[in-house]
């Protein structure tokens, strides 16, 4: 029996998911084609696409938006199990926008039936992840899952965006080296007040979660650093979604270890955006789908 944390298990899972992803994409496309231009489904989907074009890149088209929705539908049950009780999905505007479109899709009986046919598959995956009881184990699984998931289920996205994840030992080396360089060149540490840190391509959040876990941030500086001096950008919608949950979960665990409280603290430094497009628009966006 394959263990949940093994590459073999997630490789097999992502091969199945490639077929399932194709079915979801076909179904979503069919429902949108069948919907009248004035329908609620078409309206909320158009708002969703507009929001992506404004926040990410004007070149985002309906097909890419459909792929993003398929990613959300396929992996959400897995991460719901892995981060049970997490409040991110209740509060994050991007998550709410995605779920709003999904809710309108679920109103269609054929779509709901297609989803029900996968319930046994999702239950088996959820059973495998529910016993992951610490952030390190979850990060390991997330990295392997995403590596295999995008390569097999969404190869065009992986090729287009160059999705490759840095091994954790390399991440740790880079973070420690940055701290040493900062001390030697500027007399500051990553923990010091006024030292802001941005991860322009956050992926699933490994750099920031390891920063919080390695002890490079002093306990007395944790809350300030997390709430005011840490920032992360991500262009892949589902990576953004998972990175935020991952970072918030790790911060909660580290804060609790240091006696800083156990209440949920959202990571407000997380932004869904194209880092290379940041200088192209500075005006405030009023997007109905992402409120």
Language-model features: where?
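Non-catalytic, mostly N-terminal accessory regions of nucleic-acid modification and defense proteins
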Residues: 1-169, 251, 255-265
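SAM-dependent methyltransferase catalytic region
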Residues: 137, 149-291
